[in-house]
């Protein structure tokens, strides 16, 4: 269901107009961004998501809804409703762990996603990195950051190994173990891109876990494991800069200390690796 109302509504207006029998049940949960909530009527729950990024165009939020509308129930929650500034999606009952599933399970989930039809829009990291630079706190801009950004822009993004629909925010809190298996939530950054970029961006604990995931995926996708790992390593500098820039971006938007700590740690990792 999609509304044609062009003016963003408040949460209370959304509830009274479209979900009059529902009431807020949980203010925040795993996989929910700022301003989102769970609403409930008796035992039925729905996730109500708000477009929370003031610097992102409304089209990005609509893409999020369209991605969910295209994906099968074996991968993601169903998209239920859209109006400018808000969407409602199915609430997935299950268990969320901060740790990733084992390599074979996660590889199977990602391979299943990458077998789906493409979304229709490409993920472009270079303009996104430039946006993070321009939108961050000016006091946080450093010559090191600028040098790394210009070097990546000069080199250009790696040539894709295989193009597929990507989730691009795979970590334990965005994976729900339901009675029917693993599902991914929070598709805010989804788009089409290289499968190796997806694998490079997974929030792993260390290189050993990363190699296990890459090897499990290569076996399932029938790709040479060494070739896949080389491609993942080509994307690695882009992913680290993406994470550092995103932490800076969110620090500027929210002022939350967790983001500045994460940004500082990511910059330290980059400097150590030269």
From Swiss-Prot:
Q: Which reaction does it catalyse?
A: thiamine + ATP = thiamine phosphate + ADP + H(+)
Q: Which GO terms describe its biological process?
A: thiamine diphosphate biosynthetic process; thiamine metabolic process
Pathway stated in the Swiss-Prot or TrEMBL entry:
Cofactor biosynthesis; thiamine diphosphate biosynthesis; thiamine phosphate from thiamine: step 1/1
Q: Which UniProt key words apply to this protein?
A: ATP-binding, Kinase, Nucleotide-binding, Transferase
Q: Where is the signal peptide?
A: none
Q: Which InterPro entries match?
A: Aminoglycoside_PTrfase, Kinase-like_dom_sf, Thiamine_kinase
**Pfam families assigned to the protein according to its UniProt record, in alphabetical order:** APH
Supply one GO molecular-function term.
ATP binding
Which domain of life does the protein's organism represent?
Bacteria
What EC numbers are recorded for this enzyme? Answer: 2.7.1.89
Task: Please indicate if the UniProt record lists Nucleus as a keyword.
Answer: no
Job description of the protein: Catalyzes the ATP-dependent phosphorylation of thiamine to thiamine phosphate. Is involved in thiamine salvage.
Q: Which family does it belong to?
A: Belongs to the thiamine kinase family.
Protein name in the entry: Thiamine kinase
Organism of provenance = Salmonella dublin (strain CT_02021853)
Taxonomy of origin reads: Bacteria, Pseudomonadati, Pseudomonadota, Gammaproteobacteria, Enterobacterales
Chain's gene name: thiK
